[in-house]
């Protein structure tokens, strides 16, 4: 090759001629050679991997049926994973991060033309040297692999493409640290044997073998390959029964996996089709489920301004909440973790507990019924909810009856909450000698710094939205209009007894129009990265009303000169 410029893989493919097949595109096809499980085996595996009834019915079934994620209410009032007594999966300890101000997010729906979900599996090659060997990779349009896709990859026999399987299971009661060290030794072995595609699989869980948490295994192997300078020559494919929700797949890709095959989720869909819970073709249902997962990952990546799955892989755009440095430093290196938390011992205990619920240590018959954990909706024996029927009843009755004593009882119950939030674990330190009263700031001075959160008119109701503005204006605080703006009529109430004009006017990122400000605000708030996006089709039909007014709307500009000057 005479040219010294860097070239695209498809250009190199043409130059390679008949010597190399170039990029191998994996298309979906149907085969009967995929390993299948009986209903009892599926039920036992679901129990061993901690599936819940909500995940079975509301998550997997919904995505397989509709091809999109299920719609749930905003807000989380359940405990953090580290404070929960329901043994949450390791995925739950990682929180997604999103762009704020410095790196504006993108709208993956309206800007679909710039998104790319394809991934290339194989040796990356030398980007500084043009050679046909750089094209010895597999092109996969969706990193969520069907069982048949993975079967094809396992059977690939092409120059430079040598897949090798490594088990991520270990003997029951074995230390996870020892299991991971053995895993590293096995990875080195297949590397020396010439493997260029590493397939981590947890098929083989039984009475005596437990699965290493898939996220721990993937991240540990990824960082081991990085430390030993092998990450560019041996990408990771995960074959696991554990992932089933969008967040699970996002963390796996973010911590180094190139593709994931959720075989138990697919087997669960097969079972639903056979039992009549899904009235559609099995292959269509699996395809829709995989597409729903992919769409969710694209949405998550877009919050960071990332438009391609390849850029998202290995990016580690997560913050760990409730994991100790003993786990973070060696296995999730460079992950942000501001507080300590669980160690390898607690992770082992959770794995052992879930396994014992599926395979009784004494050989007795086990109850394989999925537990209704109640993470999305309250259950009497389920996950703790800060706002439960008891507290909501007190709040409603205190307001309806105008009973301040009952309201104090409500706030007392909220203050007594001992689980769920980090702040509930902290208390004030009071000096023994007290504080001179002249050094104490007055209540009137303190409340002037109070601000409400940015809650748009469409997210709550007219009464609640206006009540917040009136209340904050009376105590000289500041309410935030939210990205939906507010009616121009409310601007006319400024200075009156019931001033309904929000002190802070929020301007969203080119999503919603807003009324001219006309100096009627004390502060501006710019929002990026969250809120309802116009192309996502998420607003419930019942929230559409005649109050939506597009008249007198103006375009949003980032230039200061386009806005009227604020009142002095």
Predicted features along the sequence, with ranges:
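Short hydrophobic alpha-helical runs that function as membrane-insertion/retention elements
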Residues: 198-200, 259-264, 479-482
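Alpha-helix-loop-beta-strand connector modules within alpha/beta enzyme cores
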Residues: 212-238, 288-295, 519
């Amino acid at each position: 090759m005479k040219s010294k410029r860097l070239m695209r893989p498809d250009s190199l493919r043409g130059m390679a001629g008949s010597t190399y097949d170039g990029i191998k595109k994996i298309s979906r096809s149907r085969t009967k050679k995929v390993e299948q499980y009986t209903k009892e085996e599926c039920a036992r595996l679901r129990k061993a991997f901690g599936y819940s009834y909500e995940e079975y019915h509301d998550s997997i079934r919904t995505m397989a049926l509709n091809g999109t994620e299920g719609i749930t209410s905003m807000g989380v009032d359940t405990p953090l994973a580290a404070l929960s007594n329901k043994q949450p999966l390791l995925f739950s300890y990682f929180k997604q991060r999103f762009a704020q101000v410095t790196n504006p997010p993108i709208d993956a729906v309206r800007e679909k033309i710039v998104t790319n979900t394809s991934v290339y599996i194989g040796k990356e090659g030398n980007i500084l040297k043009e050679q046909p060997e750089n094209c010895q990779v597999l092109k996969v349009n969706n990193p969520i692999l069907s069982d048949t896709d993975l079967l094809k990859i396992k059977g690939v026999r092409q120059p430079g493409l040598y897949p090798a399987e490594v088990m991520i299971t270990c003997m029951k009661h074995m230390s996870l640290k020892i299991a991971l060290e053995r895993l590293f030794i096995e990875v080195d072995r297949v590397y020396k044997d010439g493997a260029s595609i590493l397939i981590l699989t947890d098929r083989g869980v039984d009475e005596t073998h437990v699965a290493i948490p898939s996220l721990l295994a993937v991240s540990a192997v990824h960082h081991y390959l990085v430390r030993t300078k092998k990450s560019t020559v041996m990408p990771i494919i995960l074959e696991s029964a554990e992932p089933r929700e969008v967040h699970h797949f996002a963390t796996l890709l973010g911590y180094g996996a190139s593709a994931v095959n959720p075989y138990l989720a697919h087997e669960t869909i097969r079972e639903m089709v056979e039992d009549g819970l899904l009235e559609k073709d099995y292959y269509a249902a699996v395809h829709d489920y995989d597409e729903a997962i992919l769409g969710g990952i694209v949405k998550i990546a877009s919050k960071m301004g990332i438009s391609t799955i390849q850029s998202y892989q290995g990016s580690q755009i997560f913050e760990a909440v409730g994991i100790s440095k003993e786990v973070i430093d060696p296995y999730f290196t460079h992950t942000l973790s501001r507080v300590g938390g669980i160690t390898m011992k607690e992770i082992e205990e959770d794995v052992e507990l879930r396994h014992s619920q599926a395979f009784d240590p004494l050989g007795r018959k086990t109850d394989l019924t999925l537990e209704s954990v109640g993470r999305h909706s309250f259950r009497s024996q389920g996950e703790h909810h800060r706002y439960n029927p008891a507290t909501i009843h007190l709040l409603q009755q205190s307001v309806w009856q105008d009973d301040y004593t009952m309201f104090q009882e409500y706030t007392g119950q909220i203050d007594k909450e001992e689980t769920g939030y980090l702040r509930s674990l902290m208390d004030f330190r009071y000096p023994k000698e007290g504080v001179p009263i002249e050094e104490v700031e007055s209540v009137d001075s303190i409340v002037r710094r109070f601000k409400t959160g940015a809650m748009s008119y469409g997210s709550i109701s007219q009464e609640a939205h206006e009540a917040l503005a009136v209340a904050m204006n009376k105590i000289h605080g500041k309410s935030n209009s939210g990205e939906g703006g507010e009616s121009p009529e409310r601007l006319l109430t400024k200075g009156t007894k019931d001033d309904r004009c929000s002190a802070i006017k929020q301007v969203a990122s080119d999503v919603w129009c807003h009324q001219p400000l006309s100096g009627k605000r004390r502060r501006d708030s710019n929002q990026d990265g969250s809120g309802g996006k116009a192309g996502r089709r998420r607003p419930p039909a019942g929230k559409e009303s005649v109050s939506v007014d597009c008249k007198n709307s103006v375009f949003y500009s980032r230039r200061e000169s386009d806005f009227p000057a604020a009142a002095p």
